[in-house]
Amino acid sequence: MSETKPASSKPAAAAKPKKVIPRVSRTGEPKSKPESRSARAGITFPVSRVDRLLREGRFAPRVESTAPVYLAAVLEYLVFEILELAHNTCSISKKTRITPQHINWAVGNDLELNSLFQHVTIAYGGVLPTPQQSTGEKKKKPSKKAAEGSSQIY
């Protein structure tokens, strides 16, 4: 009494696609995908994180909405400059990996960055070589006239 079902010639019932409801704004225009503030500003650094840190840090009672965007852009520019100089230093020394020492050399050899990071210590950055300055004044050579005039004949 075991009955087997005959093989049907129809393929298995395909799942019906879900009906997509278009996103529409209040005015009836189609909404675009949500975009991050970093993407809207065209920068890589996270604007939302900078905003959160500004608000949690209590640097000011109020933070304008454009302040974290500007600060993130400035931070991204500084990091780009430092990494570019460190890359140049790294390629001069024929290395493929940027180390803290390369960053320290890059910052130390650039006048503007050196003045900005004057009181900053980079961990494992090493020490920059500086020219030795003599503590005393240079000795003057006695002039010929002074040497001739000082000799006494007895």
From Swiss-Prot:
Known function: Core component of nucleosome which plays a central role in DNA double strand break (DSB) repair. Nucleosomes wrap and compact DNA into chromatin, limiting DNA accessibility to the cellular machineries which require DNA as a template. Histones thereby play a central role in transcription regulation, DNA repair, DNA replication and chromosomal stability. DNA accessibility is regulated via a complex set of post-translational modifications of histones, also called histone code, and nucleosome remodeling.
Sample GO molecular function, one term: structural constituent of chromatin
Single GO BP term: heterochromatin formation
Key words of the record: Chromosome, DNA damage, DNA repair, DNA-binding, Nucleosome core, Nucleus, Phosphoprotein
Quaternary structure and partners: The nucleosome is a histone octamer containing two molecules each of H2A, H2B, H3 and H4 assembled in one H3-H4 heterotetramer and two H2A-H2B heterodimers. The octamer wraps approximately 147 bp of DNA.
Organism of this sequence: Dictyostelium discoideum (Social amoeba)
Localization terms from the record: Nucleus; Chromosome
Highest taxon of the lineage: Eukaryota
Annotated domain remarks: The [ST]-Q motif constitutes a recognition sequence for kinases from the PI3/PI4-kinase family.
Family of this protein: Belongs to the histone H2A family.
Phosphoserine: residues carrying this PTM: 151
InterPro entries per record: Histone-fold, Histone_H2A, Histone_H2A/H2B/H3, Histone_H2A_C
Annotated stretches, region: Disordered: 1-41, 128-154
Coiled coil regions in record: none
Protein's name according to its UniProt entry: Histone H2AX
Major site of localization recorded for this protein: nucleus
CDD domains (alphabetical): HFD_H2A
Biased composition annotated in UniProt, kind: Low complexity: 1-15
GO cellular component, one term: nucleus
Chain span(s) of sequence motif [ST]-Q motif: 151-152
